[in-house]
């Protein structure tokens, strides 16, 4: 009987866990759907900013100032700035593994070349994975809020802008998971700086863009860096929720399979007990 009690307790426990994983699956699916719509809007914004910068830089009347040139040229003998986007929480499968693996490989390659390294880490899981081995390289760490927060984006952008303006870094690369679908996330290594000068053979009318005030290129650079960070954050968030949704779906299915096996085992145990009792009753009656 004690065995039956243990089986019932275990079935109850697994069912409770199954309810939690199912709820987490539904929450992640809802969050992922919302973020996907934000990604669609950000794609258009990034394309517009890139096109505008390409057009303006192709116009002879716009010349880059010394400060602006820092964002388009590689500054020798300065640090490589690596921005790592991981998750704040776990239970999202291998979401963080591919990112951390690529970052470690790149750090090793840069170390072999004798180059300087700076790390900006976004997300608790990324920080925990890198702090022991690369604590000296970590310049900043940001926790990832539960919802998409523009303040985080602005803080990261300010760190990047300040590092470039103060000639502290030669380039900036961002690591994030790009969302394909709920089951597939693509590890992406994207260069933010120096900004590539787009080449467009089409002639742009000098009068096409009108801008009142100074610092046109500087403002565009701000918008460009901001949009790149925002895009990566959204992609990373969508990928995280997709990975978590898939992981929780698998956990729910596994729980269901386990419940079926435990129920079968329970029924067999009960049947065995009943059979044993019947045999004892029959044996007793025959003895009489």
UniProtKB/Swiss-Prot annotation:
Its main location: membrane. Keywords: ATP synthesis, Cell inner membrane, Cell membrane, CF(1), Hydrogen ion transport, Ion transport, Membrane, Transport. The keyword Cell inner membrane applies. GO terms for cellular component: plasma membrane; proton-transporting ATP synthase complex. Gene3D superfamilies: 3.40.1380.10, ATP synthase, gamma subunit, helix hairpin domain. It is found in: Cell inner membrane. It comes from the Bacteria. GO terms for biological process: proton motive force-driven plasma membrane ATP synthesis. One of its GO terms (molecular function) is ATP binding. It is a peripheral membrane protein. InterPro entries: ATP_synth_F1_ATPase_gsu, ATP_synth_F1_gsu. HAMAP family: ATP_synth_gamma_bact. Belongs to the ATPase gamma chain family. Produces ATP from ADP in the presence of a proton gradient across the membrane. The gamma chain is believed to be important in regulating ATPase activity and the flow of protons through the CF(0) complex. PANTHER family: ATP SYNTHASE GAMMA CHAIN, ATP SYNTHASE SUBUNIT GAMMA, MITOCHONDRIAL. F-type ATPases have 2 components, CF(1) - the catalytic core - and CF(0) - the membrane proton channel. CF(1) has five subunits: alpha(3), beta(3), gamma(1), delta(1), epsilon(1). CF(0) has three main subunits: a, b and c. This is ATP synthase gamma chain. The gene is atpG.
């Amino acid at each position: 009987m004690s065995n039956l009690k243990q089986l019932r307790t275990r079935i109850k426990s697994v069912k409770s866990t199954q309810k939690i994983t199912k709820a987490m699956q539904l929450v992640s699916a809802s969050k992922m759907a919302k973020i996907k719509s934000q990604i669609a809007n950000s794609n258009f914004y990034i394309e517009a900013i890139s096109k505008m910068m390409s057009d303006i830089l192709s116009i002879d009347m716009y010349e880059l100032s010394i400060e602006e040139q820092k964002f388009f040229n590689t500054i020798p003998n300065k640090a490589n700035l690596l921005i790592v986007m991981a998750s704040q929480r776990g239970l999202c499968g291998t979401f963080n593994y591919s990112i951390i693996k690529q970052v470690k490989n790149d750090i090793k390659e840069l170390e072999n070349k004798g180059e300087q390294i700076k790390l900006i880490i976004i997300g608790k899981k990324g920080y925990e994975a890198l702090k022991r081995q690369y604590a000296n390289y970590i310049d900043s760490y940001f926790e990832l809020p539960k919802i998409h927060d523009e303040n985080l984006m602005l803080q990261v952008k300010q760190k990047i802008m300040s590092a470039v303006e103060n000639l502290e870094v030669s380039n900036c690369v961002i690591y994030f998971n790009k969302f394909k679908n709920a089951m597939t996330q693509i590890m992406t290594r994207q260069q933010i700086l120096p900004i590539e000068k787009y080449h467009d053979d089409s002639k742009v009318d000098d009068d096409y863009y009108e801008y009142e005030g100074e610092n046109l290129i500087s403002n565009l650079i701000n918008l460009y860096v901001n949009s790149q960070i925002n895009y990566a954050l959204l992609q990373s968030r969508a990928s995280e929720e997709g990975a978590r949704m898939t992981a929780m779906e698998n956990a729910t299915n596994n729980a269901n399979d386990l419940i079926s096996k435990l129920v079968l085992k329970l029924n067999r145990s009960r049947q065995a007990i009943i059979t044993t009792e019947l045999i004892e009753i029959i044996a007793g009656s025959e003895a009489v």
